[in-house]
Amino acid sequence: MWKQFGKYFNKYPKRRKIAQKLLEYGLRIENKSIYCGKIMLSDSKIARALEVDRRAIPATVAMIQKNQSLNKVFSKLTPTCHLKDVAPEMKWGVIEIIPEDPSIPGILAGVANIVAKSNLSIRQAIVDDFELSEEPRLYIVVEKQLPGILIPKIRDVKGVKAVVIY
Protein backbone atom coordinates (compact mmCIF):
# COMPACT_ATOMS: atom_id res chain seq x y z
CA MET A 1 0.00 0.00 0.00
CA TRP A 2 2.74 2.46 0.92
CA LYS A 3 4.37 1.95 -2.49
CA GLN A 4 1.33 3.66 -4.01
CA PHE A 5 1.44 6.64 -1.65
CA GLY A 6 5.08 7.07 -0.69
CA LYS A 7 5.87 9.03 -3.84
CA TYR A 8 3.62 11.88 -2.71
CA PHE A 9 5.71 12.36 0.41
CA ASN A 10 9.25 12.05 -1.02
CA LYS A 11 9.99 15.76 -0.54
CA TYR A 12 8.38 15.90 2.91
CA PRO A 13 9.88 13.46 5.45
CA LYS A 14 7.82 14.80 8.38
CA ARG A 15 4.60 14.52 6.39
CA ARG A 16 5.64 10.99 5.40
CA LYS A 17 6.08 10.10 9.06
CA ILE A 18 2.68 11.56 9.94
CA ALA A 19 0.90 9.81 7.05
CA GLN A 20 2.50 6.47 7.96
CA LYS A 21 1.28 6.80 11.56
CA LEU A 22 -2.22 7.73 10.38
CA LEU A 23 -2.28 4.49 8.37
CA GLU A 24 -0.74 2.44 11.18
CA TYR A 25 -3.30 3.59 13.75
CA GLY A 26 -6.28 3.84 11.40
CA LEU A 27 -6.72 7.57 11.98
CA ARG A 28 -9.14 9.16 9.54
CA ILE A 29 -8.98 12.60 7.92
CA GLU A 30 -12.23 14.52 7.62
CA ASN A 31 -13.05 18.26 7.44
CA LYS A 32 -9.40 19.35 7.90
CA SER A 33 -9.11 17.29 11.10
CA ILE A 34 -7.85 13.90 12.24
CA TYR A 35 -10.22 11.45 13.92
CA CYS A 36 -9.88 8.25 15.89
CA GLY A 37 -13.30 6.81 15.13
CA LYS A 38 -15.67 9.68 15.98
CA ILE A 39 -13.21 11.39 18.32
CA MET A 40 -11.45 14.46 16.91
CA LEU A 41 -7.77 14.59 17.87
CA SER A 42 -5.83 17.81 18.47
CA ASP A 43 -2.99 18.70 16.14
CA SER A 44 -0.72 19.64 19.04
CA LYS A 45 -1.14 16.29 20.82
CA ILE A 46 -0.55 14.35 17.62
CA ALA A 47 2.55 16.45 16.92
CA ARG A 48 3.86 15.88 20.43
CA ALA A 49 3.33 12.12 20.18
CA LEU A 50 5.07 11.95 16.78
CA GLU A 51 7.79 14.43 17.76
CA VAL A 52 7.10 16.78 14.84
CA ASP A 53 6.33 20.49 14.63
CA ARG A 54 2.63 21.16 15.23
CA ARG A 55 2.35 22.99 11.89
CA ALA A 56 3.29 19.78 10.05
CA ILE A 57 -0.02 18.17 11.07
CA PRO A 58 -2.43 20.56 9.26
CA ALA A 59 0.02 20.76 6.33
CA THR A 60 -0.13 16.97 5.99
CA VAL A 61 -3.92 16.93 6.30
CA ALA A 62 -4.26 19.64 3.62
CA MET A 63 -1.87 17.81 1.31
CA ILE A 64 -3.81 14.56 1.68
CA GLN A 65 -7.19 16.22 1.17
CA LYS A 66 -6.00 17.99 -1.99
CA ASN A 67 -4.96 14.68 -3.57
CA GLN A 68 -7.95 12.59 -4.64
CA SER A 69 -6.06 9.27 -4.47
CA LEU A 70 -4.77 9.94 -0.97
CA ASN A 71 -8.04 11.38 0.30
CA LYS A 72 -10.03 8.33 -0.88
CA VAL A 73 -7.97 6.16 1.46
CA PHE A 74 -7.28 8.46 4.41
CA SER A 75 -10.95 9.49 4.66
CA LYS A 76 -12.01 5.86 5.21
CA LEU A 77 -9.53 4.59 7.80
CA THR A 78 -10.85 2.93 10.96
CA PRO A 79 -8.96 2.12 14.17
CA THR A 80 -8.90 -1.53 15.27
CA CYS A 81 -8.76 -3.00 18.76
CA HIS A 82 -5.72 -5.31 19.02
CA LEU A 83 -6.42 -8.09 21.55
CA LYS A 84 -2.91 -9.57 21.85
CA ASP A 85 -2.03 -7.70 25.06
CA VAL A 86 -5.45 -8.37 26.62
CA ALA A 87 -5.46 -12.07 25.73
CA PRO A 88 -3.52 -13.31 28.80
CA GLU A 89 -5.96 -11.50 31.11
CA MET A 90 -8.84 -13.28 29.36
CA LYS A 91 -7.07 -16.68 29.52
CA TRP A 92 -6.77 -16.67 25.73
CA GLY A 93 -3.70 -17.71 23.80
CA VAL A 94 -1.67 -15.67 21.34
CA ILE A 95 0.31 -17.03 18.41
CA GLU A 96 2.84 -14.60 17.00
CA ILE A 97 4.25 -15.59 13.63
CA ILE A 98 7.52 -14.17 12.36
CA PRO A 99 7.56 -14.72 8.59
CA GLU A 100 10.54 -15.64 6.42
CA ASP A 101 9.14 -13.31 3.78
CA PRO A 102 5.90 -11.52 4.64
CA SER A 103 4.83 -11.38 1.00
CA ILE A 104 4.54 -15.19 0.80
CA PRO A 105 0.83 -16.01 0.42
CA GLY A 106 -0.89 -18.58 2.62
CA ILE A 107 0.80 -18.09 5.99
CA LEU A 108 -2.42 -17.02 7.73
CA ALA A 109 -4.42 -19.75 5.98
CA GLY A 110 -1.91 -22.45 6.95
CA VAL A 111 -1.80 -21.48 10.61
CA ALA A 112 -5.58 -20.96 10.80
CA ASN A 113 -6.10 -24.43 9.32
CA ILE A 114 -3.94 -26.01 12.04
CA VAL A 115 -5.79 -24.06 14.74
CA ALA A 116 -9.20 -25.05 13.34
CA LYS A 117 -8.26 -28.74 13.07
CA SER A 118 -7.35 -28.57 16.78
CA ASN A 119 -10.90 -27.42 17.53
CA LEU A 120 -9.80 -23.97 18.74
CA SER A 121 -11.73 -20.83 17.82
CA ILE A 122 -9.86 -17.82 16.53
CA ARG A 123 -10.93 -14.62 18.32
CA GLN A 124 -8.82 -12.32 16.16
CA ALA A 125 -6.15 -12.38 13.47
CA ILE A 126 -4.12 -9.27 12.67
CA VAL A 127 -1.41 -9.09 10.05
CA ASP A 128 1.02 -6.17 9.93
CA ASP A 129 1.29 -4.67 6.45
CA PHE A 130 4.80 -5.49 5.28
CA GLU A 131 5.06 -2.14 3.49
CA LEU A 132 4.26 -0.20 6.67
CA SER A 133 6.00 -2.26 9.33
CA GLU A 134 9.76 -2.83 9.57
CA GLU A 135 9.26 -6.24 11.18
CA PRO A 136 5.77 -7.41 10.17
CA ARG A 137 4.09 -10.09 12.21
CA LEU A 138 0.94 -12.17 12.17
CA TYR A 139 -0.92 -12.28 15.49
CA ILE A 140 -3.63 -14.84 16.08
CA VAL A 141 -5.63 -14.72 19.31
CA VAL A 142 -7.30 -18.04 20.15
CA GLU A 143 -9.97 -18.93 22.71
CA LYS A 144 -7.53 -20.68 25.09
CA GLN A 145 -3.85 -21.43 25.50
CA LEU A 146 -2.35 -23.20 22.52
CA PRO A 147 -1.30 -26.82 23.15
CA GLY A 148 2.48 -27.13 22.79
CA ILE A 149 2.07 -30.03 20.38
CA LEU A 150 0.87 -27.57 17.72
CA ILE A 151 4.03 -25.44 17.71
CA PRO A 152 6.08 -27.77 15.44
CA LYS A 153 3.13 -28.03 13.05
CA ILE A 154 2.85 -24.24 12.87
CA ARG A 155 6.62 -23.93 12.33
CA ASP A 156 6.27 -26.23 9.32
CA VAL A 157 3.82 -23.90 7.55
CA LYS A 158 5.39 -22.51 4.38
CA GLY A 159 6.77 -19.02 5.05
CA VAL A 160 6.97 -19.30 8.85
CA LYS A 161 10.40 -18.40 10.23
CA ALA A 162 9.56 -18.48 13.96
CA VAL A 163 6.64 -18.89 16.35
CA VAL A 164 6.15 -17.11 19.67
CA ILE A 165 3.39 -18.27 22.01
CA TYR A 166 2.05 -16.29 24.96
Task: Locate predicted features.
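A conserved regulatory-domain signal marking ACT and ACT-like small-molecule sensing domains
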Residues: 2-33, 63-166
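Short alpha-helical "recognition helix" segments of helix-turn-helix
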Residues: 46-47
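Helix-turn-helix DNA-binding elements, focusing on the entry/boundary residues of the two helices
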Residues: 43
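Residues in the recognition helix of alpha-helical DNA-binding motifs
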Residues: 60
